Amino acid sequence: MPTTKKTLMFLSSFFTSLGSFIVICSILGTQAWITSTIAVRDSASNGSIFITYGLFRGESSEELSHGLAEPKKKFAVLEILNNSSQKTLHSVTILFLVLSLITSLLSSGFTFYNSISNPYQTFLGPTGVYTWNGLGASFVFVTMILFVANTQSNQLSEELFQMLYPATTSKGTTHSYGYSFWLILLVILLNIVTVTIIIFYQKARYQRKQEQRKPMEYAPRDGILF
């Protein structure tokens, strides 16, 4: 059976891993990743179109100083995109976030297992926890980079705008990233905290072993022989 200290420290890591899993589920399920404001100006209308979306769903609305505004439109991101580079990169972004979700789940399982058992010398021990959290942080960071690249360089919002308002001409776009996007940083932080807790545990375990060896190293020879 593990010591009380080990149980408490690995349970702490379990809760941070579980927190990471819950946050990623929230990121996947919400659509407040980005709001793109697209200026429109032509003979029939003048104003802005706001497109807010996440990985799966979004909505758009118009604010016009003159002209007849269309009602709000709800859409599925992947469904309205043609077979384009934007759709491919968006799909890869989703894939990496799902991979990070899986690694968070595995980290939760490994940390909980370590809190009730002692698989220290196997991959099920701290090595596995380090591996899954390292991969998870990497996957979610790549997700962040891919999404920014797709919106800024690959003009994902502009492509959605063209699909939603084919008869309207864009005069410029600005982007504002929402809380769903910034929660990715919280996931990375939780991965770091999980690993840090295990590092402190291993350091304390090593120091305890060293202290247990010292009495034997400095004991009188007669006492050792006895």
Swiss-Prot record:
Membrane topology: Multi-pass membrane protein
Residues bearing glycans: 83
GO cellular component terms, semicolon-separated: extracellular exosome; membrane
UniProt keywords, alphabetically: Glycoprotein, Membrane, Transmembrane, Transmembrane helix
TM annotation in the entry: 8-28, 92-112, 129-149, 181-201
Subcellular location(s) per record: Membrane
InterPro entries assigned to the protein according to its UniProt record, in alphabetical order: Clarin (IPR026748)
GO BP terms: sensory perception of sound
PANTHER family according to UniProt: CLARIN, CLARIN-3
Family classification: Belongs to the clarin family.
Identification of the protein by name: Clarin-3
Taxonomic source organism: Homo sapiens
Lineage: Eukaryota, Metazoa, Chordata, Craniata, Vertebrata
